[in-house]
Amino acid sequence: LAQIEQLADDSGGAFDPTLGKVIRLWDIDGEDPHVPEQSELEALLKDVGYQNVTLDGNKVTLAEDTTLDLGATGKGIGCDVISEFLKDQKEVEGMILNLGGSSVMAYGQKPDDSPWKVAVTDPRDTESDYLGAITIKGGEFLSTSGDYEKYFMEDGKRYHHILDPKTGYPVWNGLDSVTIVCDNGLLADGLSTACFVLGMDDAMELLEKYDADAMFVDEDKNIYLTDGMKERFELMKNTYTVKAVQ
């Protein structure tokens, strides 16, 4: 929780673990996905804010009507737990773990010492060939957040599950997906969400603070790579253009 609160603060609230009620209102991956009334959103947004969570050692205090939702980092936390468990399993020399398609952990080495490679989904053609591959080392974690994972269409508009904590609406900033590589599963998950909400330009300072590599895919089929990601990424689709982050 301390890591989550710190990330929320460092991202200026772009990542917010108290957004659960608003997420459930949209019901995007449920049986009744719909666009809520503005009045419904406003009623719930007044209780949203990571500042409403107070940590004192192992004691967690929430402001009245504020709820805590760790769903955005759940798979990353799972990767961290498994990584720690594997350290005591001497018979396991190396493995790669994929949780739900969006969170990946590499542990140890492959038998032939070649690098681990993780395929990256094309956010606008999820059923076809992969967009590319990213190399990660043992002890590294990869997470992708995209508007193609959970969404519904209404009046020609895509309503996806990555919500802006300030407005309660899906983030529409020209990005289709963000992929993060770093040395912590929770942070990889949280950073991919935070950077999607912030947008590429505003995410740079946050990425530098956490020493994380990133790939941004936009709606015009441009792929922007941070310096560290340039060495990791291999393009597999010539319908996309690779560019450096300015």
PLM features per residue range, with description:
Residues 1-246:
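Mature catalytic core of soluble alpha/beta enzymes
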